[in-house]
Amino acid sequence: MNKKTKIEGLENFLTLNNIIFKDIKYYIQALTHKTYANEHANIESYDILEFIGDAILQMKSSIFIFQHFQNITEGEASLIRAKNVCSSGLSELSKKLGLSKLLLISKGSEHLRENVKINADLFESFVAAIYLDLGDEKLEEFLKEIFYPYISTTNLESIKDPKSSFQEYIQSYSNEIIEYKITQLENELRSELFKAELMHNGITYGVGFGKTKKVAEEEAATRALETLKAPSKQTIKKAIKAEKKE
């Protein structure tokens, strides 16, 4: 699919989502991966918009959490924000919107189209594009429809100190320690992004991404706890018990 066709698809997408744009250039940039920008003249990647969008979502989510959740501490508010303004959470929203289908990316990088971090970046970039093109009022309409309902369903108890919660659960079945395998991602993604794999006895229970090792580890622990709540929980219990017998 060529750029012209993608832009036509973008215009239709914006119309369907009640975003009456003033300047399409913001949205084109928001959906342009740097591998595509590197191969084409006079087009910029979404990197700077992703930076702006991240800052906007941090602020907007903080205000919403303060208004929506009663009697919470600063630490609890930070946990709720970290749970929702993270790669996995924003990636889910991006995929629901279908942003990756509109992504301009080099042919050699097509395998990255469904990448979690890239989809999260797309959501942040798209938020920045709406803000820069149409202002705060229109962005609020968009966030009320797409983003705030996602935050409002957060169960605070389920996200309190996910690393300790997972460790306590594992220790109830096994004496083996858990570890976090940290990888710094570079090249096609971006430097200063960390991937954390939560591992126990050679098995990966959760994977997280973050701009710091701490954030990546917390997200990995959160994903691991979600795995334990899934239908496969009994299978995991049996596997851990089997380890104890060995």
Curated annotation (Swiss-Prot):
SMART domains: DSRM, RIBOc. Residues 161-230 form the DRBM domain. Mg(2+) binds at residues 50, 121, 124. Residues 10-135 form the RNase III domain. Keywords: Cytoplasm, Endonuclease, Hydrolase, Magnesium, Metal-binding, mRNA processing, Nuclease, RNA-binding, rRNA processing, rRNA-binding, tRNA processing. Its EC number is 3.1.26.3. The active site is at 54, 124. Disulfide bonds: none annotated. Its cofactor is Mg(2+). GO terms for biological process: mRNA processing; regulation of gene expression; rRNA processing; tRNA processing. GO terms for cellular component: cytoplasm. SUPFAM superfamilies: dsRNA-binding domain-like, RNase III domain-like. It catalyses: Endonucleolytic cleavage to 5'-phosphomonoester. GO terms for molecular function: double-stranded RNA binding; metal ion binding; ribonuclease III activity; rRNA binding. InterPro entries: dsRBD_dom, RNase_III, RNase_III_dom, RNase_III_sf. PROSITE patterns: DS_RBD (PS50137), RNASE_3_2 (PS50142). It comes from the Bacteria. It is found in: Cytoplasm. Belongs to the ribonuclease III family. Homodimer. Digests double-stranded RNA. Involved in the processing of primary rRNA transcript to yield the immediate precursors to the large and small rRNAs (23S and 16S). Processes some mRNAs, and tRNAs when they are encoded in the rRNA operon. Processes pre-crRNA and tracrRNA of type II CRISPR loci if present in the organism. This is Ribonuclease 3. It comes from Mycoplasma mobile (strain ATCC 43663 / 163K / NCTC 11711).
